[in-house]
A protein has these predicted regions:
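Gram-negative (and chloroplast) outer-membrane scaffold detector with strong preference
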Residues: 31, 60-134, 145-148, 156-165, ...
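Cleavable N-terminal export/targeting peptides
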Residues: 1-29, 196-198
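Extracellular loop and loop/strand-boundary signature of outer-membrane beta-barrel proteins
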Residues: 44-48, 83-91, 133-140, 174-179
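Transmembrane beta-strand segments of Gram-negative outer membrane beta-barrel proteins
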Residues: 26-42
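Catalytic Tyr-X3-Lys helix of short-chain dehydrogenase/reductase
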Residues: 153
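Surface-exposed strand-loop-strand hairpins of Gram-negative outer-membrane beta-barrel proteins
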Residues: 37-58, 143-144
Length: 198
């Protein structure tokens, strides 16, 4: 994993941990999870290729403070590089999605919760080449765009604090001119653990 990706992951979890531990006595619960997903987006067109496909591993965390409301964050990235056809030839690329959300998590039934989220973040598309980078031993350039997102998941607790969460999230990316559309939908599942009541 490249150093920038490690820093992004560490920053996301540091923010969640800081919020969690500074108000742990007031928090109803704290979740941490690892997930695997894929993306679905409009087909490739004259604007650019589609973001559809690929495996996206990622980490997420959230803290619920008041009743069923809280905050959370997540980072998902494409596990393998894909290829972007340009006038300069084929360029390998890898998208990364980082967001911070408001969370609402009502209980539906015994050991089952609905998780609704909406927030803001960024899509970072890394384009790899031997001649590019920032002079600090990186072999990519980075194209970042602001995004909004919203999503839902069903959280099942089969045993204790361990949970399984099938989920979907829609990303609305501004000025995403490298690809066929300004939106993409992530479908996947996460496994994680809840600290506190559930």
């Amino acid at each position: 994993m490249k150093q920038t990706l490690r820093i992004a992951i560490l920053s996301a979890f540091a923010c969640a941990a800081l919020a969690a531990f500074s108000n742990f006595a007031q928090a109803q619960k704290v979740d941490f999870a690892f997930g695997l997903s894929t993306l679905e987006a409009p087909a490739a067109n004259s604007t650019g290729p589609s973001l559809t496909g690929g495996t996206y591993p990622g980490f997420s965390g959230d803290v619920l403070f008041w009743h069923n409301f809280g905050i959370g964050g997540e980072i998902y990235w494409r596990a393998t590089q894909s290829n972007y056809a340009s006038i300069y030839g084929t360029i390998p690329y890898r998208p990364l999605f980082l967001d911070f959300d408001g969370i609402y998590e009502p209980k539906l039934a015994s050991h089952t919760y609905l998780e609704l989220s909406a927030g803001i973040g960024a899509m970072d598309t890394r384009q790899y080449c031997s001649e590019c980078g920032n002079g600090y031993n990186t072999n990519y350039t980075s194209d970042k765009h602001f995004m909004g997102d919203f999503g839902a998941g069903l959280k099942f607790y089969p045993k204790g604090g361990f949970f399984i969460r099938p989920e979907a999230k829609v990303y609305l990316v501004t000025n995403n001119q490298l690809f066929s559309s300004s939106y993409a939908t992530r479908f996947g599942a996460s496994i994680g653990y809840t600290f506190g009541r559930h």
